[in-house]
Swiss-Prot record:
Organism of derivation: Nitrosococcus oceani (strain ATCC 19707 / BCRC 17464 / JCM 30415 / NCIMB 11848 / C-107)
Cross-referenced Pfam families: UreE_C, UreE_N
Taxon lineage: Bacteria, Pseudomonadati, Pseudomonadota, Gammaproteobacteria, Chromatiales
Main location per the UniProt record: cytoplasm
Record's protein name: Urease accessory protein UreE
Family: Belongs to the UreE family.
Subcellular location: Cytoplasm
Gene Ontology terms, MF aspect: nickel cation binding; unfolded protein binding
HAMAP family per the UniProt record, alphabetical: UreE
Ranges of compositional bias, category Basic residues: 157-167
GO cellular component: cytoplasm
Gene name of the encoded protein: ureE
SMART domains (UniProt xref): UreE_N
Amino acid sequence: MLCFERRLPSDTPADLEMAFTFEQRERSRLRFPLPDGREAAFLIERGAPLVEGERLGTAEGLVLAIQAKPELLMEVRTSDPLTLVRAAYHLGNRHVRLEIGAHWLRLPPDYVLRDMLMRLGVEVFEVTAPYQPESGAYGGGHHHSHSHHEGDEFHSKPRLHHFGGSQ
């Protein structure tokens, strides 16, 4: 299995490109099939989701370009900026991860949130688009190890999450 373990500069020429959903890009360990059928995984530090255009490398020198896979989302719009800010406030109060544009908010589909948003006076549309929510005010990550031994990164053996095929 090929292990993509190193983050590389985004201008590093890529040998292949693959698209992942935000949920997949948020994981620090993920097993996946390459287009040619070989098994691969990324094994990266926790706390920093992969973003569109990022590059990962293997010890063998193979470089993977990360793409954000389009996914079904709710897009919140209104012509009134204050109403949009109110909607963002109420979603934030519920710890909903948001992608914020100049005139819209995007979030994963949720019928309860859709009803709340409609009551606030915004329009809610279904869109299919790449999803890259805000990372949060504090940088979004729990970066230290709980190990008491220098060099031990994991308390227990890391688990790989699977997608696209048999486990």
